[in-house]
A protein has these predicted regions:
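Short amphipathic alpha-helical "interface-anchor" segments enriched in bulky aromatics
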Residues: 20, 117-123, 271, 279, ...
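Acidic, His- and aromatic-enriched active-site or binding-groove loops in soluble protein domains
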Residues: 245-256
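Short, positively charged, Gly/Tyr-enriched micro-motifs
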Residues: 33-103, 112, 154, 158-164, ...
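Active-site-proximal, Lys/Arg-enriched surface segment
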Residues: 85-175, 289-293
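A short acidic (Asp/Glu
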Residues: 127-130, 233-240, 256-262
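Short, conserved catalytic/metal-binding motifs centered on acidic residues
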Residues: 52, 66-69, 113-127, 155, ...
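A short, flexible helix-boundary coil/loop motif
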Residues: 1-44, 172-188, 194-204, 209-213, ...
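Electropositive, glycine- and tryptophan-enriched low-complexity nucleic-acid-binding patches
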Residues: 59, 77-81, 142-220, 304-318
Length: 454
């Protein structure tokens, strides 16, 4: 074994980069090629640029700060050109990487644990007048008013331990700030960016079904699809069932949308006809006590479905399951997991830069949102396979500290060796020292992906 191999073997056992380890496990190079991330005649390898963006997010560094403090950073124009490139398939990159991660955690599932796909949307405030895809009047549940914002419809995966981001679309309504024809980039109609831009005017339900179909076609597996009352329409649920995905949802109490067979056609009428004859069970959610019962009902479009009527004393909530074998108690417990996504959005905003994109060009917004979700998935996976799982916030801070400390320490070590090599007597006595320094420096950069100034 040569000197180079001896040094690399010794360092590999000590110098561990959790980010690169995950990327290697999911075969990120293959995923990049499948998603059309190939190096052009001029420029840097896409893998290296994506790795730098991941480090910026994990280490909580602005792009300008990362460029200033990292010896191996590229110029700012390289990063800007990269996120505006129309040929890259960002959607395929996110779906394939999340599917690969989900395959890695598949052996960790226990019998009886449900794997869930969850469709939800989030509103990210955007004040700028020229941000492509943003709208003037988007209702924010957080601020309880209409605001200037991006409306992001997302498909998420959740189980009893983790959540992952699988896909997303930007939805533009009639209050759009810019028409699609006014977007900055003039794109070829066959480019990936053009195809993605064209979907922006589709309905939420259409976007959701398309995301679900893509995920299933790319190997994402789940037991149930969870949606809120916005998506809970008979035609939507029927299409999800046709894709082989049972649906659990809260229903809107709307007699125009939901009309049942038989004597009692509305949800209120069905509830009134059954409430005195059915055994009621009790439960507690926080400080709220409730009673519920379930019933199998016939629907004109969906056939036999199970409804769960939950009464808190003030409000009547109705849940649907197209799987009629599942118990009412389990339907309620499963639907509660939909709210885990709210914590996921919070982590994305606070830790992974979602909503903080400083771009107005549509292609760049898609790229930065994808990178935020991709980095979230990596950190969530690292947390899942640890023997002592933490909150994502705790793990995020640990990784931030670990990566930066490791990079600075190795840089200092190399500087010390370099100073030693400059002593004439040492060089005479040990001709291999300069080679050792070169090998350590190159291997450290390869394993970390960057070097920090001390």
């Amino acid at each position: 074994m040569g000197l180079d191999n001896y040094i690399q073997t010794a360092m590999r056992s000590i110098l561990k980069n959790p980010i690169l380890e995950v990327l290697s496990e999911i075969k990120i190079t293959k995923i990049l090629k499948q998603s059309n991330f190939v190096k052009r005649e001029v420029g840097y390898p896409p893998f290296q640029i994506i790795l730098h963006f991941v480090y910026m997010l994990v280490m909580n560094k602005r792009q300008s700060t990362f460029i200033k403090n990292s010896e191996n950073a590229f110029g700012k124009d390289a990063y800007y050109r990269f996120i505006k490139e129309s040929r890259y398939n960002w959607r395929k990159f996110l779906i394939l990487s999340s599917a690969a991660i989900l395959q890695r955690i598949k052996p960790l599932h226990k019998n009886g644990e449900h794997r869930l796909l969850i469709i939800d949307d989030t509103v990210e405030p955007k004040r700028g007048k020229f941000i492509e895809g943003s709208c003037k009047y988007v209702w924010s549940n957080k601020e309880h008013k209409s605001i200037n914002a991006l409306n992001i419809v997302s498909l998420n995966y959740a189980d009893s331990h983790s959540t992952f981001q699988v896909d997303f679309s930007i939805k533009m309504n009639d209050s759009k700030r810019k028409e699609i024809s006014e977007f900055t980039s003039k794109l070829h109609h066959r480019s990936n960016s053009y195809q993605r831009k064209s979907e922006i005017i589709k309905s939420k339900n259409t976007l959701a079904i398309e995301m679900l179909e893509r995920a299933l076609n790319n190997g994402v597996e789940a037991d149930y699809l969870l949606v809120d009352s916005w998506y809970a329409k008979p035609n939507f649920i029927e299409k999800a069932n046709e894709l082989g995905m049972p649906v659990i949802s809260r229903l809107p109490n709307n007699k125009l949308i939901w009309n049942f067979k038989g004597k009692h056609k509305t949800m209120n009428a069905i509830y009134e006809s059954l409430k005195n004859s059915r055994h009621k069970s009790g439960g507690q959610h926080g400080k709220i006590s409730y009673k519920y019962f379930d019933a199998i009902i016939e629907h004109a479009v969906l056939g036999k479905i199970k409804l769960v009527f939950l009464h808190t004393g003030k409000d009547l909530l109705v849940f649907i399951s197209t799987d009629i074998t599942i118990a009412g108690k389990e339907i309620i417990a499963t639907y509660k997991k939909r709210w885990n996504i709210e914590q996921g959005y919070k982590d994305l905003r606070n830790l992974f830069g979602l909503g903080k994109e400083e771009n107005r060009i549509y292609e760049a917004l898609i790229a930065k949102i994808t990178l935020s979700m991709f980095t979230y998935n990596i950190v969530s996976y690292i947390n899942r396979i640890k023997h002592e799982p933490q909150t994502l916030g705790e793990l995020f801070r640990d990784l931030e500290c670990e990566l930066e400390t490791l990079a600075i320490s190795m840089q200092l070590f190399i500087q010390i060796l370099t100073k030693i090599s400059e002593i004439q007597n040492v060089v005479k006595d040990n001709k291999d020292l300069l080679q050792i320094i070169a090998v350590i420096s190159a291997f450290t950069q390869k394993e970390l992906g960057f070097m920090c100034e001390s």
